[in-house]
Design a protein with these regions (language model features):
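Helix-to-loop junctions at the C-terminal end of transmembrane segments
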Residues: 56-68, 152, 257-270, 352-353
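A late C-terminal transmembrane helix in Major Facilitator Superfamily
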Residues: 325-354
């Protein structure tokens, strides 16, 4: 049975993800429309946010472990509210990029704390708790991207700031009730149940290491695709609202993957599933960026979302299926995401800047980087077998 405290934390997670997607993913439409940002500028903005994400998430996990998750969520929500308020006041390109970085710090304090709160003291219920966590944030993200474009067209670009700000205030209003229920839960005597076992203890560390390799590369792909969606939409003559609808399919596919892999656990500690999803991601990444029709774009998105769903699920599940240091592991899990958020768009921007006339050079360079990541995955697996 899920405790009332965890239900409220899942609700906070849902609201937070919707607000985060509404702001961060459609910021690139705002920058393109308001300041004339092209592919290089949008990719560089995404890369800068990714670099901040690495440090903020890593430290966020440590701070959650040291000072408590509830306190850190309060601080993170405060940072998000402050940054979005500044975004409404200062409307130059430079200040908007700085606001994005400040917002990233705030949200990076929230995610590791939420991951820790829903997985702590779960015992044998861990797969269920992580499954609900993944389905919840994926649902918030998918619905957020699907509806954000339409809402922005109706409410105006200013809603990019005030709507997520208002949702974050709602999170702050819910948090005291969640903290009160959590305190009651912690005061109760609970029977410790063992974690879900791997094949052997060595496999636990091996699969955690491999998942921490694969997950950053999945975000290399994601954070290269998202800043380029305004360009894809322009190429296919899609409005902002239609781009949100059409290009949200991969998020719904990821949601379906989370739901399936939550209910079916046969993929736990199975290398073929992790490797196969990595290969599928690479193929569909090229299909996503190089599609010349909406039909091909939709097909590529389905494979893209399914593969990323398993890769992310593996990273979070293996990070939490340990006996201690949940906060630190959650922070490292998020920091690995930040590494991907930085490297992907940085690589794409660099190649577009150096070879601007080459057709599809950004996609090919990042695709090559993904192939390097897959080789690293095989190398880690091979080293384990040989040893």
């Amino acid at each position: 049975m899920i405790s009332p405290a965890k239900i409220l934390f899942y609700l906070i997670e849902l609201i937070n993800c919707y607000a985060a997607v509404y702001y961060s993913n459609f910021l690139f439409f705002y920058l393109r429309r308001t300041f004339g940002f092209g592919e290089v500028e949008n990719l560089l903005t995404a890369a800068l946010g990714g670099f901040v994400y690495i440090i903020a998430a890593w430290q966020g996990g440590k701070l959650a472990q040291r000072y408590g998750c509830i306190r850190l969520i309060y601080i993170g929500c405060g940072g998000v509210i402050l940054s979005l308020a500044l975004g409404m006041i200062f409307t130059t390109a430079t200040t908007q990029v700085m606001v994005f970085c400040l917002w990233t710090v705030g949200v990076c304090f929230i995610w590791p704390a939420l991951e820790t709160l829903v997985s702590e003291r779960a015992g044998a219920e861990l797969p269920k708790m992580v499954g609900i966590y993944n389905v919840t944030w994926a649902a918030g993200g998918a619905v957020g991207y699907f509806t954000a474009g339409i809402l922005i067209e109706k409410l105006g670009m200013a809603s990019l700031f005030w709507l997520p700000l208002g949702l974050t205030v709602v999170e702050l209003a819910i948090l005291p009730f969640a903290a009160r229920w959590l305190k009651k839960d912690n005061n109760r005597q609970c029977h410790e149940v063992s974690l879900t076992p791997a094949v052997c203890p060595a496999d636990t560390k091996l699969f955690l290491r491999m998942a921490w390799i694969a997950n950053p590369f999945s975000y290399v792909a994601i954070n290269t695709v998202i800043p380029l969606i305004p360009s894809i939409a322009e190429k296919l003559s899609l409005s902002t609202g239609m781009a949100g609808i059409v290009c949200s399919l991969w998020m719904f596919a990821r949601l379906a993957a989370f739901a399936a892999f939550w209910q079916w656990t046969g993929w736990h500690y199975r290398f073929r599933w992790l490797a196969g999803s990595f290969l599928l991601m690479i193929v569909c990444f090229f299909g996503f960026l190089m599609a010349h029709s909406i039909g091909l774009l939709l097909i590529a998105q389905v494979g893209f979302g399914l593969s990323i769903g398993l890769i992310y699920y593996s990273s979070l599940y293996y990070s939490m299926n340990v006996t201690e240091n949940h906060g630190s592991n959650a922070g490292l899990h998020e920091a690995m995401i930040g590494a991907g958020l930085f490297v992907g768009p940085a690589c794409g921007a660099a190649t577009l800047y150096l070879v601007p006339t080459a057709i599809g050079i950004g996609a090919w360079s990042v695709g090559g980087l993904l192939c390097v990541g897959f080789s690293g995955l095989l190398l880690v697996r091979h080293y384990r077998i040989k040893s």
